[in-house]
Design a protein with these regions (language model features):
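Extended, low-polarity segments enriched in aliphatic/aromatic residues
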Residues: 2-53, 57-61, 67, 72-80, ...
């Protein structure tokens, strides 16, 4: 396979070239204008950030992206799917409110904001890919219906995947709530009876008649009928239907790669990642710990696998910040250049396994050429 081209822009600015200008120049040089954008519904997949977390990509970048896409005739919209865990982004109403609090709205972002899997995370399409782990990933409908996919990725650590980049944003981020259950879980859901109030919503909406209320009006799952679709987890507002067992990091990354294939199947796509505010954990937390390395730059590519590998390599090569962060406290007199910082922080994770699987199933290549502009 030919080397993928990954384009890199540093963060140095001048009075005639600010960071937004540099991002636009990077995108154009990397070939975003070659996409069939005219009259296309173009999904800009971005993480709006859990309220309290300040490491997410600023809405200014999203607005510049939307305006650039519109200049090519596209109909862009910002989008994300609801979360599996209970929080401020587990349903569309709270999710949109959270996005607005963090600066993402039609005025500031210069385009509409759409929660792709609907009000309660149950609006999705199954995309058949014949995957080894996920035969038919459940993708949020607004993303499945989009003509073109653009991912804007904050590159940072992740406590289960090792790091979060393009594949994490695509594979996990575009999954419906039930899809996220398939990604995370190694078994069927269970009922935390102490939280169940007997509201009956899971019983009414189980497509497989696998749930009933017992004599104590607590939900019970018939595992001979349960297919592990996750609808009960998506619908329960009381943390009563929950994930039973979490999958390993390696299998999670395999599944993320396969979900990414489903998201991008038969669609033109393009990706940009920001190595800024590289926090040790994901933006789903309501806080962000201190950055572990200096801000490095922005990278863009048509190949999400090459993009993730290039970002990982740059972080590995970078020195650790000697400030009060999780790595500096343990390695006070070391610069850690050449060290796998994500594995040092999360030793039970294996991010490289996901990239290898993504390469194996044809999503992209880890063999890249870094082009500095």
């Amino acid at each position: 396979m030919e080397k993928a081209k990954v384009y890199f822009s540093d963060l140095r600015t001048s009075p005639t070239s600010n960071l937004l200008d540099k991002m636009e120049r990077l995108l154009k040089r990397a070939g975003i204008g070659q996409l069939p954008l005219k009259d296309s519904f173009t999904a800009i997949k971005i993480h709006f950030g859990e309220p309290g977390n300040l490491a997410y990509i600023r809405p200014n970048y999203a607005a510049r992206m939307a305006n650039l896409l519109r200049s090519f005739g596209a109909k862009p919209f910002l989008t994300d799917c609801n979360t599996l865990y209970s929080g401020r982004r587990s349903n569309a109403v709270d999710h949109l409110q959270s996005a607005m609090e963090n600066g993402f709205n039609p005025i500031s972002a210069q385009c509409q904001v759409i929660i792709a899997d609907g009000l309660k995370g149950t609006d999705y399409r199954e995309i058949p890919i014949d995957g080894e782990y996920c035969p038919a990933p459940k993708i949020g409908t607004a993303i499945a219906d989009a003509d073109i996919i653009i991912s804007m990725n904050h590159f940072k650590g992740h406590e289960q995947a090792g790091f979060g980049g393009a594949l994490k944003n695509l594979g996990m981020g575009c999954a419906s709530v039930g899809g996220k259950l398939e990604l995370h879980a190694s078994s069927q859901p269970k009922v935390a009876t102490e939280n169940c109030i007997g509201c009956n919503i899971c019983v009414k909406h189980c497509a497989h008649d696998a749930i009933h209320l017992n004599a104590e009006r607590k939900a019970e799952i018939d595992y001979t009928k349960c297919v592990g679709c996750g609808q009960c987890v998506a619908l329960c507002q009381h943390d009563a239907a929950v994930v039973s067992d979490w999958d390993t990091s390696e299998r999670l990354n395999y599944k993320i790669a396969e979900y990414s294939v489903a998201v991008l199947k038969d669609k033109p796509h393009f990706h940009i990642s920001f190595i800024m505010n590289v926090s040790p954990e994901c933006n789903c937390w309501n806080h962000n710990d201190a950055a572990i390395i200096p801000d490095l730059g922005m990278l863009a590519s048509a190949d999400p696998v090459a993009l993730d590998k290039a970002c990982a390599d740059l972080v590995i090569q970078a020195p650790v910040l000697h400030s009060d962060n999780v790595l500096a406290k343990k390695h006070e007199h070391e610069d850690l250049c050449g060290c796998d910082k994500f594995h040092m922080i999360h030793p039970d994770t294996d991010w490289l396994a996901g990239l290898r699987h993504a390469e194996k199933i044809g999503l992209g290549t880890m063999d890249y050429e870094l082009i500095k502009i």
